[in-house]
Amino acid sequence: MFREGKFNIKKYRLFIFVILLLVIYIFLLKNDWENSHRGLTFAMLDVGQGDGIFIESPTGTQVMFDGGPPRKVLGSFSRVMSPFDKTIDALIITNPDADHIGGFLDILKNYKVGVVFESGTLTDSKTYQSLREEMKNQNIPDILVERGMKLDLGGGVMIDILFPDRDVSEWATNDGGVVARLSYGKTSVMLTGDIGAKTEKIILSENSEAQLTSTILKVGHHGSHTSSSSSFVKIISPEYSLISDGKNNSYGHPHRETLDTLTKFGSKILRTDLLGTIIMKSDGQDVNFSFHK
């Protein structure tokens, strides 16, 4: 039987004090996180042999370019996302191979996703079909990108879609992948997915040098010799070249031919297999890198 009585505040004083301190600590932690993530954040996550890129604009809009292989990407989120944040505005599938989309299923099950963009290349892989089924179950819009589309992330950050410029449903998944250029003030990133020389030639033929030159090149196909042709790298003229690959991978990525090409044009090479997650921050003028294994 419940008995009425006076609440003894002295008895619970320490408990209340601890709770109050905890609330203040969480508030300060959240505020510090938000302050430290102003400007543009671009992170090539260490997902092993695959691609997983996180982008956050100054206004907090978050986009994932690819999600890496299964069971890899969530472990890297602590480097770039607040633990209180459980939403991602958009996922972009550059191509539907498992090393690019495997982690997206994990993301869909743990985060609220606003929209998915993809190129339109097709595959009957179990991984891709499972991803599409989960997207359908959650009623997530699925949009095919095309050349000329602009994704405004807010705060001056823009993603310009350069490819596909045509129906790529019957193309090889790598060649038909999404190519985009991220820009923020004087900072720009060329995002190439796994495209090879065939698609690089199309990109060069359809765009001026001013439209392509970028501060950073996300090196195509994990540094394979089938990508990053001399003519392409010369026009992009990247100050930095970022390569996402697994340590001691069976493909031998990055290939020596690619490394030599990047070096020939004076680009500084940064690799996830050597440095771990690569985080670039920009205020629209300068870029700063940090590395996290």
Question: Model-derived features: where do they sit?
Answer:
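Non-globular, low-confidence helical/coil segments that flank catalytic cores
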Residues: M1-K293
